[in-house]
Amino acid sequence: MTKSELIEILTKRQAHLKSDDVDLAVKSLLEMMGGALSEGDRIEIRGFGSFSLHYRPPRCGRNPKTGESVALPGKYVPHFKPGKELRERVASVVPLAECGDITE
């Protein structure tokens, strides 16, 4: 699901809200979450999961084109840990790519 699809679905489910208001709410939420993570804060949404930063230490990489070794600096990357309720909800789901041909 893309951000545009999410906005469209929310607009249909909440008919009393204007599409522009839903668009603003979704974009504001994502902006606030990105801002919190960029300040090093942890975001926890009970039943869904938590977002935090994980440190990736410096390492030696390789330029795939030349094969030359390249020193890569350490960095922080976003990390999502699903909550218990979300894990239970998706435990029995089979992704469409693994289902094979739907017409069978």
Curated annotation (Swiss-Prot):
**Which cellular component terms (GO) are annotated to the entry?**
chromosome; cytosol
Which superkingdom is the protein from? Bacteria
GO molecular-function terms, A-Z: DNA binding; structural constituent of chromatin
Q: Its function?
A: This protein is one of the two subunits of integration host factor, a specific DNA-binding protein that functions in genetic recombination as well as in transcriptional and translational control.
Task: Give the record's subunit note.
Answer: Heterodimer of an alpha and a beta chain.
Family named by the database record: Belongs to the bacterial histone-like protein family.
Name listed for the protein in its UniProt record? Integration host factor subunit beta
**Naturally occurring in which organism (per UniProt):** Xylella fastidiosa (strain 9a5c)
Identify the gene encoding this protein: ihfB
